Regions:
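Cyclophilin-like peptidyl-prolyl cis-trans isomerases
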Residues: 2-254
Length: 254
């Protein structure tokens, strides 16, 4: 499903599975056919399979993004934030992942496939270039009885492990995400997740805008929860579907 300059071959595709649970109750399985002919695709497959104890297992659907407001709102994609650090969980041991510890080597894959339909899976590899770069946040702290201004570093850029699954065409993702595959089984599971109630997005509230402009941490925490499902949606298991052995000439149908 990738386009020129390179045509994906059938043997390049690997199927990855994700077993979904809502509040610990099994919901169903999603299977994604991934093009391993790209660096981004190989990275996604490795994280689905697991490397050095690091994988998408136990990560969550963190947001259900929508377009429009109120009764006109429509769900456009599910978002997973990926893994925070390239280390074995519970330790400081670094893990080597295909593509390295950042998204830099994945950037050349941008634009090879548009987010023009439902069921496309893509890695988040950079911030939206149309938005301003985040700046360090100033805050006052008391040092030996005096107030001093300190600056918290801005959030890091995407590390190329978070991903989205489209629920309809989402061309706004073309500037930030690299398509690595498509859902080939479990569309009904996607639909059930998309209908879950989420935390209301209050970015249009003047009170929120003021709080964010002055660096109020409560506003920053609240913003991270916008469009988050009220119920925990988790990838309980994930991995790679074993490929069937090709039929021999004697076994081939006549």
């Amino acid at each position: 499903f990738l386009v020129a300059p390179r045509r994906a071959r059938a043997e390049d595709f690997t199927e990855c599975f994700f077993d979904i649970a809502v509040e610990g109750q099994p919901l169903g399985r999603i299977v994604v056919a991934v093009d391993e002919g790209t660096l981004s695709g190989r990275r996604f497959v490795e994280l689905a399979r697991g490397v050095g104890g690091l994988s998408y297992r136990r990560t969550t659907v963190d947001n259900i993004e929508v377009s429009g407001d109120g009764d006109d709102a429509v769900e456009i994609y599910l978002k997973n934030n990926g893994v925070e650090k390239f280390v074995t969980p519970g330790s400081d041991a670094s893990v080597d992942v295909v593509g390295g510890p950042s998204a830099e080597r994945l950037l050349p894959d941008l634009g090879k496939r548009s987010h023009d339909e439902r069921g496309l899976v893509s890695l988040i590899v950079r911030r939206d270039p149309s938005e301003p770069e985040p700046e360090p946040k100033a805050r006052l702290v008391s040092v030996r009885g005096k107030f001093e201004t300190v600056y918290d570093p801005p959030p890091p850029p995407p590390n190329g492990t978070g991903f989205t699954i489209t629920l309809r065409a989402a061309p706004e993702l073309d500037a930030t995400n690299v398509v690595v595959g498509r859902v080939v089984s479990g569309d009904e599971v996607l639909e059930e997740i998309s209908q879950l109630p989420t935390v209301k997005d209050n970015t249009s509230s003047p009170f929120f805008a003021v709080a964010k402009s002055i660096g109020d941490k409560r506003a920053l925490v609240a913003e991270q929860a916008f469009r988050k499902p009220f119920r925990k949606v988790q990838f309980m298991k994930c991995g790679v579907v074993a490929k069937s052995a090709p039929a021999s000439e004697d076994e081939a149908p006549q």
